[in-house]
């Protein structure tokens, strides 16, 4: 099959990539390729879900078609994750600030240990930013985070495996470019956000997703509030493995119920505002998703697990005698117990760990249509 066309570069004005030995990992030798299972259906949405006693099939290595909704000449490539490994781990407790957290630095320590001991990520190929360090380059300021994100993806080659983990405060800001169905962009807060400002999902997508070549894997774990679309990945999957679509019918019922309630209370202004808001949302919802799909797809293999939906908060938890982020803890725990899971099994395992303890619902999203019954690799 012919090679996919190069992804069109789009300029952005962010800080230059980090330089110096601190951000210069040594070369990582390619690991031996594991035996390949038979390739699933190219799109794979209806391939049978593997049982717990059955090893899920590995990702196919031929170029895949995006299908409906994406530019017709685009193809994407799954990564075998046999090449170089690099990781960026960010944990911010906001020490000494009014909104201080407790578990984020612990999250980074636990995730880095897991990557090193179980996933063959070398310490010298990790950049760790936490706000308890003395080295100014290791503090998770806005500038350091942006520079480290550029370091992470610099010179990435097909079958490389990149990993980013963020544990800290997240939030929402009004969307300015029309690519969000709910009218808000997701943001993360650096330790110096009060003076430097937040980092928007559009910005992170431009730095870490847009430049990647076909076959490069970026695995992202965002353990923060309102993190559902923190990388602006257009394909979102439910626990049944189906592609999620905006549920305007459900939202219509909720908004019209609010309008009826306003009328019953004699609040005609409230009724008018609610009705207008619904019809505006119905009009832009589909176009916002189409804009996201058309502009935020990627031929690379980008997969993200986020701590909550866009509208939800994420919780700290207390496990094994220390504070931790709920998603960070559940992600490591489920993979340590069952390392060979499909994407769908992993999402359900994470949700099962949190169910009954927290209201948040971790999300799975991807830069391309994903066969969720394939083996999760990174």
Curated annotation (Swiss-Prot):
InterPro entries: Caspase-like_dom_sf, Metacaspase, Pept_C14_caspase. Residues 1-70 are annotated as: Disordered. Its EC number is 3.4.22.-. Keywords: Apoptosis, Hydrolase, Protease, Thiol protease, Zymogen. It comes from the Eukaryota. One of its GO terms (cellular component) is cytoplasm. One of its GO terms (molecular function) is cysteine-type endopeptidase activity. Gene3D superfamilies: 3.40.50.12660. Residues 10-29 have a biased composition (Low complexity). PANTHER family: METACASPASE (EUROFUNG), METACASPASE-4. Involved in cell death (apoptosis). This is Metacaspase-1B.
């Amino acid at each position: 099959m012919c090679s996919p066309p190069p992804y069109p570069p789009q300029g952005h004005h962010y800080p230059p990539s980090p330089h110096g030995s601190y951000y210069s990992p040594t070369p990582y030798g390619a690991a031996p390729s594991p035996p390949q299972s038979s390739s699933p259906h190219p799109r794979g949405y209806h391939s049978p879900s593997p049982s717990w006693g059955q090893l899920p099939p590995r990702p196919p290595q031929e170029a895949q078609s995006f299908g409906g909704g994406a530019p017709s000449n685009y193809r994407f490539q799954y990564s075998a994750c046999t090449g170089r490994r690099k990781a960026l781990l960010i944990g911010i407790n906001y020490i000494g600030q009014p909104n201080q957290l407790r578990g984020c630095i612990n999250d980074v320590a636990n995730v880095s240990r897991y990557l090193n001991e179980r996933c063959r990520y070398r310490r010298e190929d990790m950049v760790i930013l936490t706000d308890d360090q003395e080295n100014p380059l290791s503090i998770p300021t806005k500038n350091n985070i942006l520079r480290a994100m550029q370091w992470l993806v610099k010179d990435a080659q097909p079958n490389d495996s990149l990993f980013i983990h963020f544990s800290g405060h997240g939030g929402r800001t009004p969307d300015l470019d029309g690519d969000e169905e709910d009218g808000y962009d997701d943001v993360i807060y650096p330790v110096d956000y009060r003076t430097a400002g937040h980092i928007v999902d559009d910005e992170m997508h431009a730095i870490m997703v847009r430049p990647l070549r076909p076959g490069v894997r970026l695995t992202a774990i965002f353990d923060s509030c309102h993190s559902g679309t923190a990388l602006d990945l257009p394909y979102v999957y439910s626990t049944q493995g189906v592609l999620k679509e905006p549920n305007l019918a459900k939202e219509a019922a909720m908004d019209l119920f609010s309008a009826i309630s306003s009328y019953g209370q004699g609040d005609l202004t409230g009724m008018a505002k609610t009705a207008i808001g619904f019809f505006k949302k119905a009009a832009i919802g589909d176009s916002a998703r189409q804009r996201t799909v058309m502009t935020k797809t990627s031929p690379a293999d980008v997969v993200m697990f986020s701590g909550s939906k866009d509208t939800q908060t994420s919780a700290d938890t207390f496990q094994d005698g220390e504070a931790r982020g709920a998603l960070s803890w559940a992600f490591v725990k489920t993979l340590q117990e069952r390392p060979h899971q499909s994407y769908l099994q992993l999402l359900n395992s994470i949700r099962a760990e949190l169910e009954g303890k927290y209201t948040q619902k971790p999300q799975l999203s991807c830069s391309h249509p994903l066969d969720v019954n394939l083996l999760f690799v990174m």
